Structures are given as C-alpha cells and as structure tokens.
Amino acid sequence: MVAFTIEQIRGLMDKVTNVRNMSVIAHVDHGKSTLSDSLVQKAGIISAAKAGDARFMDTRKDEQERGITIKSTAISLYASMTDEDVKDIKQKTDGNSFLVNLIDSPGHVDFSSEVTAALRVTDGALVVVDTVEGVCVQTETVLRQALGERIKPVVVINKVDRALLELQTTKEDLYQTFARTVESVNVIISTYCDPVLGDVQVYPQKGTVAFASGLHGWAFTVRQFANKYSKKFGVDKEKMMERLWGDSYFNPKTKKWTNKDKDADGKPLERAFNMFILDPIFRLFAAIMNFKKDEIPVLLEKLEIQLKGDEKDLEGKALLKVVMRKFLPAADALLEMIVLHLPSPVTAQTYRAETLYEGPSDDPFCTAIRNCDPNADLMLYVSKMVPTSDKGRFYAFGRVFAGTVKSGQKVRIQGPNYQVGKKEDLFLKSIQRTVLMMGRSVEQIDDCPAGNIIGLVGIDQFLLKSGTITTNEAAHNMKVMKFSVSPVVQVAVEVKNANDLPKLVEGLKRLSKSDPCVLTYMSESGEHIVAGTGELHLEICLQDLENDHAGVPLRISPPVVSYRETVEGESSMVALSKSPNKHNRIYVKAQPIDEEVSLDIENGVINPRDDFKARARILADKHGWDVVDARKIWCFGPDGNGPNLVVDQTKAVQYLNEIKDSVVAAFQWATKEGPIFGENCRSVRVNILDVTLHADAIHRGGGQIIPTMRRVTYASMLLAEPAIQEPVFLVEIQCPENAIGGIYSVLNKKRGQVISEEQRPGTPLFTVKAYLPVNESFGFTGELRQATGGQAFPQLIFDHWQVMSGDVTDENSKPGAIVKEKRVRAGLKPEVPEYTEYYDKL
C-alpha cells in the first residue's frame, strides 16, 4: 500500500518520461473493472479486503447494480520498479518510480463513445480478452478505435480461472487457447495498424501479453517466470523468455532444449510453457481444490509462499485466492507490463501530434505537442464532462498536451467549431481550480504540466462536450473525436406536470453535456427529442435525466428510429426553379453517391476541411471520380460535414461566386430536412448545371437565392427515384448449440439476415452474426432470451444504412407506411409531395 500525498504525485508529474496514460478496453463482461480494481488496490486507494468485489471504478449506483461500467473514470496509480526492470525499458526514463494514469472504460457497445473519449487522452491501451469467449465484436471495435488514435496496445487474457475450474482443460489445450487468442488479436492489429506506429503486434515471449484472473486477483507474464528461472538456473533472461513460449521443449534427461516435441526415443516432451509456467499453477489448483492437506505445505514451501496465522485455516476457493495472490499478484504483473511496454507521453506525442492537431504540422503549437513541452503555450484537450458530487456542475476532464495549466489562469476556451481568427465558439475565462481525478473523489492541485490527465473546475458553462483550451490566439483546435456509433434511436420526452418544464429543459442541457454521444433537440412540432445509440444507452440516459439532471417525473414516448432520405438514380430531367422575383434561375440534377464515398466522408477520410486538391486526389484515385468535378465540390451537407455534396458543373457563369454562400446555406437546410419526410439526407450529390442571374446585385441577394436553391434541390431529388435508408445493427450472439434454432426464428420474425455462424474452437459455444434493422430491434433482447431460455446474449452495434426497397409514395409499401406515419406525426400533409410542387416551368 502506498500512502499518497498530493506533493508526491505532483513531483512525479514533472518527470514526464515516467508517466503512463493508459485506458482499459474490452468487450462487455470480460472483466475490465475487476482487473482495474486489483491495480487500484496495489496503488493503495481501496483496502485489500474489499478488492475484487468493490468494483471501485464503477462510481455510479446503477453501474454497481447492473454490474456494467457506463462512464469512464480515471485514477492515478503509483508503481516502483527494480533497477533491473528499468534497464529493460526501451525509452528514456528517470529514476524508478512511475505514475500510471488509468482510465477504465465501458465495454458495452452502446457506450463506445465513452471509450473514444477515454482513448483520446491516453497513449496506451490494456486490451482485456476473456479466455473462454475469445475476441468478440466489441473487442475488435475498441481495438480498431485505439489503433486509429495511434495508441499502442498490450493484451491481458483474463478469466484463466474459468478455464481451469469450469472447463477443466489440459495444459496443452490451454496453451492452444492462449495462442489462438493472441493470434486473432494480432490479425486485427495488423489489419488496422498505422505505419507510423510501427509493428505493435503483441507477443507473449516479449512480455506484451499477460494471463490473469481478475476475480482471484492473480496474473503473470512470461517475463516474470523467466526472471524466476533465470536466477535459479543462471541462464540469460532474454533467452529464457524466448523459450517459454511457442514450440520449444526441454528434455529433463539430457538437460537440453529442442524444438521437436519428441525426444530421441520417440517419447513426447512437454512444451516449456506448460512445464515451467502452467505446471506449478495447475498443481496448486489441483492440491487446493481437491483438499489434499498433506501436499499443500510442500508446494507452498517450494514456491516460497508464506501464510499468516489465520490464513492457514482456510480451504477450497478461499485458500486458492490467498495463495495465488501471494504467488502471482495481479498488480505486479500488470504494472510491470504497463511500465515496460506502453509509451510515456514524451514518446507517444512525437507520433501522435499530427493526428491530434488540426492546424499545420510545423507551427509552434504542433511542435510543442510533439516535444511535450511544459514551458510552451498551453494546449489542453477536454475530452468529456464529468458530473460533480453536487448536482448540476461538471468537471472538464482532459489532458494537457503542451504547456502547464494552473488554477486561476486566464485561458481561451475553444469549442469544436472554432476557427482561428473568428469569434464564434470562443470564450475567454479563467480556470477556477485544477483537480486530480481519483475515481470517486477529487484532490485539489495547484498546476499540472504537459503529458498529464487533469480535471478543471469552472469552465463547464462554456463547453458542450469537448473542446480545446489554449492561451494563445494563433492556436488551432485539437481534432474533433470520431465516434464509431451514431445516435439512431430517439424518443420524445415530456413532463407530467407542466410547471416542471424549465427543469426539463435544464436537465436536457446537462444530459447532453455529460454523455458525448447523446443528441437532444426540439422538433418542429415542439417535442423534446432525446436520441441515443441503442436501447440500453437510451434507457440509461432517460433514467439519468429523470433522477439526476431534471429530477422531475417524465412521460416518454415509444422509441422511434431515425431514417435517412436518399436517391437511387439520376434525375429523369433537369430540375429548374425560379427565384421569388422571377429574375434568377437555377438548373440542377441529383444523383446518388457510392456507399464507399459516403462512408469515407462519415469516417473523416474525405474531410471538408482538407485541401481541395488532396481531396480530389482521393476521390479520383480511390473512387473513380472525374478530377474536374472532384475539385469543384462546393460543400458537404448537412452541418457542413455530412455525406451529401454540391458539385459545380457550370461553364462560364457570371457572378457565380457571389451566390456561393447562399447556395451552400440552402443546401445545408435542404439536406437537414429532406423533401420526403423531413429527415436528414444521405448519399445525394447535386450537380449545378447552369445558373442565370440578374445583372443587378440587389436582385440576387440571399433572400432570392436560398429558397430557390432549396426548392430545386427538392425537385431534383424527387425526380431521381427517391428512397429511404434505414439504420441496421450488426448483432453478435454467443450461445450453445441447442439455442441456435430459437435465434433463427426470432431473427426471421424481425427481418434479420444471418451472415455467419461459427463454433469457437475448444468450446461448446457458437457465435452467430446477423444484420438486424434498428426498427425491429426493440424488445429483441427480451424475445431472444425467451426463445432460447436465457442462453443467448446479444450485442447490437450500429453497422450501416441500407436502402429500404419499395416505393416511398405508395402508402401500402413498407417504406411508404413509415413515411406517412412520420409525416402525420410531424403535422405535414400525409402524401409525399409531387416534384411539380418545387419545379418551375420556363
């Protein structure tokens, strides 16, 4: 146990080479929080008696009840290394005490925006994988997110006790399971890896994979055992590590190493990993769980484990826990792996600077980030808001990338839409206090240098969810985070008692602050809408809203899915609209954009802020666009970054650039509320073919052009086979064989289509993957559990948009019925308008 004073931590913060910022990421229920507990216990923040069941990181009541992590929380740990260990660190270090900032993030798919926020402020990730279940859909998603942020992973294979106690595997089987898991992690890493990072695949023989049991509180790496044996046999430790994994065998008769699994007489030899590492563990388990009273003391003496007075009377699982914790304490193995193999901020910011900073990569601010310089101008990124213990206020939670942040310092608070030299989305305020985040509590601290994670008090009124804090007006923003999920399920919320309305409005503001991936807005008909990523996410948001943020009883409508409007063909004729004063005309055609281009826009590969030549290059080389068109993209819409484009195909039009702003504004408006039923548009490209403008500037102002452009966009879309797209979930279900029939029947009932079904080798479990329209997903979990007797556990994650087949104008078709219902609910005429409503004759 380490007794912390704030001064000691503050001292460690200055040695940035000895800081490690890391997050724990994994699939739901693979045991992140339990592992984090054993780390926290080592750093001396909770008492040893409670670890394992304390779930210290789960700070919220509902997290402890549901047994899942919802928000990500941060904690500082202290690790001290022996001089021998420090020698093995491949980067610059200073002394042998280390500060580890640990962020535990949720594994449940619906909360993956929380994971993104946690990843942005860290440099390394501890990826937890369940021995029995292996790599699942969410493991892959979070690992992909981490590699996209240029974060270096190390792996923990958790729940080894399950394999030993539940499945009773043999040593060789267990080795094969481990090897398979490591392999599948490396496949994902090599697929998504950024060349700048170099090879970040994980290898047990290099010490970047640990094997653990979070519940029992023990863990080991190959390196630890190599340490023990190299001292015992006087062999070189590095050589020993290589031999303790893979196909190497020790022949006890000849005392020689070999890579063949049989000796000279053809007798099978035992793999070194099994013989030297698994054997002592298996023996302990066998002796203790079979209550062999006489064997236990002999084994303990051999392994140099001493039991205290009352521990000698324990037996069974309780004794097993105590012994394994003494033999292989989890925190030692994990902290050693974190300190040895994860980068310090100094190392990481050299290659992460360009992905973090929006401005030019050679300006002084990017250079300061690259050098992690505590004396430069302040660059701090706030990744999310954390509610304080007194209701209604938030800590801004973020990381200092350059400079030093102090209490009472005057700073510039730049929201996500801020641009250098402009005034919007910018506040000049001073920071009231800087605090250290410690899980459930916070500690006040005077200042915090570059490379560390910090909480700020007093700026929550000026930031919505995330933003950049600097002290220099020339500094650009840090790049906005990319969320891998989008809010597609929405409900309308109203108060039961009309007097409570102001509280609801205030509560909605707070809710959207505290969760990075929730959308709250007011619809045209005056309803308050809350949109989330899935059923569970929405349920928790609404529960938060009712109990904490608004604190008033609410009425909640049944959930509705958001759709997208699109076109499937090119406009059948050129659409034309005239301005209200009849002096200006715009001629356009609409056509669909390929799904791949839309995805690239949504994932930020094709970016509206990029240089137009670079953007044209990608479009021409990767997607086969005409270069001239690709250079003349006027804007992306809606919100300036959506997957719809205006392309200027006009030839020699006078005054054209004067109306560009009006056209862009109109297009944003038209794509935000499409012609079919007022939803966002997606994958629509509008080509401006010709424009006739009045010679007098006064007759072609915004008031003339904007409505015209909006009408002509609508007309061209209605002429181009309009259709709607619905969101589709990717479902992953793990279940035993006898439950598969039930799964198929539920999926068929809900328009689902199965894409793969495979058995996990070495287990009786099957993994079924399927596409399920979000529209049909409500109550899916419940029905699935009924049909399979509670054996199937689904994971839903938003995957893609898919066009609904059928005519939108025919109310008897499936999409037509959806359109009609939505139009009636929004108070529009039930029929989809004809194109003639927006089309003007010459």
From Swiss-Prot:
The modification Diphthamide is found at H699. One of its GO terms (molecular function) is GTPase activity. Residues 17-346 form the tr-type G domain. One of its GO terms (cellular component) is ribonucleoprotein complex. Its main location: cytoplasm. Keywords: Cytoplasm, Elongation factor, GTP-binding, Hydrolase, Nucleotide-binding, Protein biosynthesis. Catalyzes the GTP-dependent ribosomal translocation step during translation elongation. During this step, the ribosome changes from the pre-translocational (PRE) to the post-translocational (POST) state as the newly formed A-site-bound peptidyl-tRNA and P-site-bound deacylated tRNA move to the P and E sites, respectively. Catalyzes the coordinated movement of the two tRNA molecules, the mRNA and conformational changes in the ribosome. NCBIfam families: small_GTP. This is Elongation factor 2. The lineage of its organism: Eukaryota, Fungi, Dikarya, Ascomycota, Saccharomycotina.
